[in-house]
Amino acid sequence: MHINQLLQHANSDLPLLQANFGLERESLRINKTNHRLAQTPHPTALGSRQFHPYIQTDYSESQMELITPVAHSSKEVLRFLGAITDVAERSIDQNQYLWPLSMPPQITEDEIEIAQLEDDFEFSYRQYLDKKYGKILQSISGIHYNMELGADLMNELFELSGYQSFIDFKNDLYLKVAQNFLNYRWFLTYLYGASPLAEKGFLNEELSQTVRSIRNSHLGYVNTDDIKVPFDSLENYISSIEHYVKSGALSAEKEFYSAVRLRGSKHNRDYLTKGITYLEFRCFDLNPFNNRGITQETIDSVHLFILAMLWLDTPKKLNQALDKAQKLNDKIALSHPLEKLPKENSASLIIEAMEALIKHFKLPSYYDDLLIAIKKQVENPKLTLSGRLFEHIKHASLEHFGQKKGQDYHNYAWQNYYALKGYENMELSTQMLLFDTIQKGIHFEILDENDQFLKLWHNDHIEYVKNGNMTSKDNYVIPLAMANKVVTKKILRENGYPVPAGAEFDNKDEALRYYSQIKNKPIVVKPKTTNFGLGISIFETAASHNDYEKALDIAFIEDYSVLVEEFIPGTEYRFFILDGKCEAVLLRVAANVVGDGHSTVRQLVAQKNRDPLRGREHRSPLEIIDLGDIELLMLQQEGYTLEDILPKGKKVNLRGNSNISTGGDSIDVTETMDPSYKQLAANMATAMGAWVCGVDLIIPDTNLKASKGKPNCTCIELNFNPSMYMHTYCYQGPGQVITGKILAKLFPEISTKI
């Protein structure tokens, strides 16, 4: 069977949409003060360009290149790009932003510094480009769209094709897509062209009118006119480029700047034996109306377009057809943004192919909607990207528009700065670790998003991380021991560390009989194996029998076994221990409200919960304050109800425990805490055998120094998988970076290269 009619003969259940995607986005760093090209080096926060897989520099030191990992869906690739963009925006200097347009602002060659790369070849290659094309032309930016047809899709098409060699089949299939893409590329230039003008001084001769896409015209970043590479066969394609390299017309194979590039091997000739792996489509201008430079709708519309290239037959006289198509593309690129497609266009053929695909393979209605939008743009150029951008041109310039959009997107990156855009549904500690992973250039894969399970790697070194800090560094049994508060107390007591006295109960009746022994004492009632402060009731004065019974009911909901311990007076502090060292100390203030003289307790809680730092399920630095049984019991002990109005300045606690996870406030006291307590907490974690540990100490007076013989404190709990976000993004205080230190411990070879 011929490749040309392959899809037409495929069954409707073919996994047509199965594909792998990758995006590359170029953007210039701009100085906020003068809106000129930033003159600072590539940010040191972004690790080493020797190996960074996600954030590189393109031609110049100020031109960032954001590169997604391979994604198995179009949604995932855009999410990757959004996260990498988020990291880039928050890693550049605070007085900089990323330019949102393909064409640069006003710029001079003196402002452009070639990227200071350690790779001698790459640096020399950029020097060569400077001499041949000039620095200014290199400042044009865009989006590269990479796509590989899915393995199941390729296998089914191969079986249908009748080919004997899978490599030959792949090569012919991808070459056909490349051929048709070049033949119909002008359609994408019409829809997505977004470089309508050049700022003063960019072009040698000013344009007579605003256009659709300078970047996609002969005025953009293209090879010299003498470079003509045929696409009629893979052998001719390879031989032609090799000839130009050998003759010196091209310095390397990668200097061939086609709108589509065959990818998968370092050298083109390897495609004959190893096969083309995927295609790189290089003709997309940045969409300045989106902070990522491209939208989901564009990605999916282009995907449909590429599949249509597989549906359509290739032209019979290919080389002549591609020459004609190139001229048409240049004409459309240099036409006015509000001008309709020229009469010689064959847009109807492309649209019909898309319609046929949707119908034949029964694609979701979403693709019908995409096609409807495309048809509207064909009829009305105002709806195209350049048509929309045309409205923002002022005094033959887009600089003001670019400045505003660029700064808006930079500010957006700093909104909810504790989160990683696109991954907000994951636990905050995991988001923070992912941010640092991307920033430092460590490869990552989310193995299970709901379970917060990550795979991280650099070269051959692989680490698995769960919930932000559960790693292979901790023995399996250690978290189990810390989850069991009885076991924890026994181990600490055996090692000479102070813990509260108390008793354990497996049933409520037995615990109620214990009341006679504690009825006149302050106590704490808590589940045996809970975390995050769940099910804990604290009585700083003696509890009534009724309140004690309520506390037992609350605790038994969380676990089958309950502890009743003595209440230790003093202030509770959380010490974060990593590999035998205290990295942070937090004073946690129990969930509370402060009266204003006219609001009820219920209203005060609602007001405090409106703080943007508060959220749920560990997705925000602070947690929403609930009004459940525990809070109502605490409120009752203080003599108030939810409908009472608190006097101005009156503080009322709603929880006895001070966990941030139950609505508490976080105050960083790392720098002011006496080092003796930090060391004592670290020693406790070491005694437990924990690599990562949260140590909760009650300290009556921090002015007194601590020692093992005279600790002046009591350990009420050790926590496996301690939260990290509360140490970094605090209610008060400077905050301490934790996730970066976790990565440095896991990948010491990375930190030595940064």
UniProtKB/Swiss-Prot annotation:
<dbReference type="GO" id="GO:0005524">
    <property type="term" value="F:ATP binding"/>
</dbReference>
<keyword id="KW-0460">Magnesium</keyword>
<feature type="binding site">
    <location>
        <position position="717"/>
    </location>
    <ligand>
        <name>Mn(2+) 1</name>
    </ligand>
</feature>
<dbReference type="InterPro" id="IPR040657">
    <property type="entry name" value="GshAB_ATP-grasp"/>
</dbReference>
<feature type="binding site">
    <location>
        <position position="719"/>
    </location>
    <ligand>
        <name>Mg(2+) 2</name>
    </ligand>
</feature>
<dbReference type="InterPro" id="IPR011761">
    <property type="entry name" value="ATP-grasp"/>
</dbReference>
<feature type="binding site">
    <location>
        <position position="696"/>
    </location>
    <ligand>
        <name>Mn(2+) 1</name>
    </ligand>
</feature>
<keyword id="KW-0464">Manganese</keyword>
<feature type="domain" description="ATP-grasp">
    <location>
        <begin position="489"/>
        <end position="752"/>
    </location>
</feature>
<keyword id="KW-0547">Nucleotide-binding</keyword>
<comment type="subunit">
    <text>Monomer.</text>
</comment>
<feature type="region of interest" description="Glutamate--cysteine ligase">
    <location>
        <begin position="1"/>
        <end position="333"/>
    </location>
</feature>
<dbReference type="Pfam" id="PF04262">
    <property type="entry name" value="Glu_cys_ligase"/>
</dbReference>
<feature type="binding site">
    <location>
        <position position="719"/>
    </location>
    <ligand>
        <name>Mn(2+) 2</name>
    </ligand>
</feature>
<dbReference type="GO" id="GO:0046872">
    <property type="term" value="F:metal ion binding"/>
</dbReference>
<dbReference type="InterPro" id="IPR006335">
    <property type="entry name" value="Glut_biosynth"/>
</dbReference>
<feature type="binding site">
    <location>
        <position position="717"/>
    </location>
    <ligand>
        <name>Mg(2+) 1</name>
    </ligand>
</feature>
<feature type="binding site">
    <location>
        <position position="696"/>
    </location>
    <ligand>
        <name>Mg(2+) 1</name>
    </ligand>
</feature>
<feature type="binding site">
    <location>
        <position position="717"/>
    </location>
    <ligand>
        <name>Mn(2+) 2</name>
    </ligand>
</feature>
<comment type="pathway">
    <text>Sulfur metabolism; glutathione biosynthesis; glutathione from L-cysteine and L-glutamate: step 1/2.</text>
</comment>
<keyword id="KW-0067">ATP-binding</keyword>
<keyword id="KW-0436">Ligase</keyword>
<dbReference type="InterPro" id="IPR014746">
    <property type="entry name" value="Gln_synth/guanido_kin_cat_dom"/>
</dbReference>
<dbReference type="Pfam" id="PF18419">
    <property type="entry name" value="ATP-grasp_6"/>
</dbReference>
<dbReference type="GO" id="GO:0005829">
    <property type="term" value="C:cytosol"/>
</dbReference>
<comment type="function">
    <text>Synthesizes glutathione from L-glutamate and L-cysteine via gamma-L-glutamyl-L-cysteine.</text>
</comment>
<keyword id="KW-0511">Multifunctional enzyme</keyword>
<dbReference type="GO" id="GO:0004357">
    <property type="term" value="F:glutamate-cysteine ligase activity"/>
</dbReference>
<protein>
    <recommendedName>
        <fullName>Glutathione biosynthesis bifunctional protein GshAB</fullName>
        <ecNumber>6.3.2.2</ecNumber>
        <ecNumber>6.3.2.3</ecNumber>
    </recommendedName>
</protein>
<keyword id="KW-0479">Metal-binding</keyword>
<dbReference type="GO" id="GO:0004363">
    <property type="term" value="F:glutathione synthase activity"/>
</dbReference>
<feature type="binding site">
    <location>
        <position position="717"/>
    </location>
    <ligand>
        <name>Mg(2+) 2</name>
    </ligand>
</feature>
<comment type="similarity">
    <text>In the N-terminal section; belongs to the glutamate--cysteine ligase type 1 family. Type 2 subfamily.</text>
</comment>
<comment type="pathway">
    <text>Sulfur metabolism; glutathione biosynthesis; glutathione from L-cysteine and L-glutamate: step 2/2.</text>
</comment>
<dbReference type="InterPro" id="IPR007370">
    <property type="entry name" value="Glu_cys_ligase"/>
</dbReference>
<feature type="binding site">
    <location>
        <begin position="516"/>
        <end position="574"/>
    </location>
    <ligand>
        <name>ATP</name>
    </ligand>
</feature>
<keyword id="KW-0317">Glutathione biosynthesis</keyword>
<dbReference type="InterPro" id="IPR006334">
    <property type="entry name" value="Glut_cys_ligase"/>
</dbReference>
